[in-house]
Amino acid sequence: MSDAFPTNGNRAPDRIDLDAGAVKSGGACSSKDTMREAARTAGKSDILDQYAADYPVDAAAGPHDQPQSMCPAFGSLRVGLRMRRTATVLSGSACCVYGLTFTSHFYGARRTVGYVPFSSETLVTGKLFEDIKEAVEGLADPENYDAIIVTNLCVPTASGVPLRLLGKAINGVRIIGIDVPGFGIPTHAEAKDVLAGAMLNYAREEVAAGPVAAPRERSDLPTVTLLGEMFPADPVVIGQMLAPLGLAAGPVVPTREWRELYAALDCAVVAAIHPFYTASIREFEAAGRPIIG
């Protein structure tokens, strides 16, 4: 009989030693403090400082001090998977990517999620960034996609993988690179704002540069952009309440299509339905749009 199962009946439950110390090499996951320190050392201080300012976890400072029930990157992943003509690529530990893709498909996603694997060697030498760039270049087909969202999870963020060096566009396809580490984003609600804010920033710069694609539907009335995810029937009901005021419900941010971002920016006012969208509010304010709520 195998020695793996003792025959004397003295079995003890398996336990993981949580105080064994963080693994400092090989791309392994570590404690939040260790990962945060590594990310700052790798040049990500500006991003972490912005997240800390946008999403303070002090309960007295705002609504972001919530128990984290799952990887926050699920929020941004779900937003990307719901958008038309948008591809999503993840860079992170295989176990993290598996959990995120499993959860996203459990919630009804019917899109393929791109994944760029790494090893300790590719992480340390910088080859991971080259692999990401090669993958995005192969995926960037303007016939199929308006945008490609590339997301760094914990380990690539802590290692300083510079998604900003991918550029703004490849083959005419917009590239949105974001860092969504579990040690910097409180919950998946804030991660939705990270992506929505990044896309609004890109779209706002496009509008400033020249003509952009018209929305599929346009109201003759001034519109109210609705900031925060909601059920499909909610904008209809809100629109009925706005009609007597001479207003119409505009796009819901996060949007379902890239061109809706332009319509969202072209509004009379923004109604902040949810309290988590700090980065998005910053972009609307930069566009000169008043915020209510």
Feature map (PLM): residue ranges:
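An N-terminal assembly and electron-transfer interface module characteristic of large anaerobic redox
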Residues: M1-G293
